Amino acid sequence: MIAARAANLQVAMKALALAVLALAYAAATARAEQCGRQAGGARCPNRLCCSRWGWCGLTDDYCKGGCQSQCRVSRDGGDDDVAAVLLTAPGGGRAGVASVVTSDQFERMLPHRDDAACPARGFYAYRAFVAAAGAFPAFAATGDADTRKREVAAFLAQTSHATSGGPYSWGYCYKEVKGATSDFCVPNARWPCAPGKAYHARGPMQIAYNYNYGAAGEAIGADLLGNPELVATDPTVAFKTALWLWMTARSPSQPSPHAVVTGQWTPTPADSAAGRAPGYGLTTNILTGGLQCAGGNGGADRVAFYKRYCDVLGVGYGPNLDCFGQAPFDGDIMSASAAK
């Protein structure tokens, strides 16, 4: 089964060759530094460290070597340390994603990610997830409690499908495609490929192509054009790339998955005519460019992961779970799991 999933991921890479993503809109909205003297003295949310370059994070690159504020925490603590120290709300208790999904619930959702059969074993840690989420303060912090739970369930469901070794508790089994036959480098003046580097699918959302690595790296403060391997070696960076794809609208007419699941998107008459409606199903449409909206097992798998995770979090599923019959926005593909 795992070999078959690997083959499916390779097929997904070929499907991505048909898409050219419109990144100008995303890059224009994600360029500014986040903290410190570069941002008027602002502090990072959730008590993350502010690096010398003005970016928020948890690793030693952020917390040491010129760190500007909130520098006492490094990534060496355990999961409980991250929740208690980094994600403490001003009035006590937990804040951010740690207030929505606990480490125990994370383990229940992804019990096999560290199985010996999974190439990503030991990589996708809860502490890396909550640290990465701290760089996106609106994630799991928009709307009421049920909305926040559904967003976490939706994000983990889509990324579980992208990295799955089987249904529906084998999410996060893979961290990159093995044996890629292409370097996924295409001509791009703004995001040129670095010599000898490959931009195949990596991380929870299986980010691929130099233009995605470049834009994501700029947004999170990492040189992913020069060091794309970071997405498969640094779990916090890996989660940040997935969250960037989740939080970023690809064009003014196409919402981010975050905007959809948190109720911030309202369909236009053109959207309604195209069958596009609020709900988890629309995130599949956005992430796959509509490739899984004509039926097939891929869309059904995504729904099954989502339902299971909603059950773990104790929240209802909401409407419109699949995208069957929905027209794509513009054919762009955000996730390399589009053909799975």
From Swiss-Prot:
Its EC number is 3.2.1.14. CDD domains: chitinase_GH19, ChtBD1_GH19_hevein. Expressed in pistils, stamens and lodicules. It holds the Pfam family Chitin_bind_1. Disulfide bonds join C35-C50, C44-C56, C49-C63, C67-C71, C118-C173, C185-C193, C293-C323. Coiled coil: none annotated. It is an enzyme of class 3 (hydrolase). It comes from the Eukaryota. Transmembrane segments: none annotated. SMART domains: ChtBD1. It catalyses: Random endo-hydrolysis of N-acetyl-beta-D-glucosaminide (1->4)-beta-linkages in chitin and chitodextrins. SUPFAM superfamilies: Lysozyme-like (SSF53955), Plant lectins/antimicrobial peptides (SSF57016). Residues 1-32 form the signal peptide. Belongs to the glycosyl hydrolase 19 family. Chitinase class I subfamily. This is Chitinase 7.
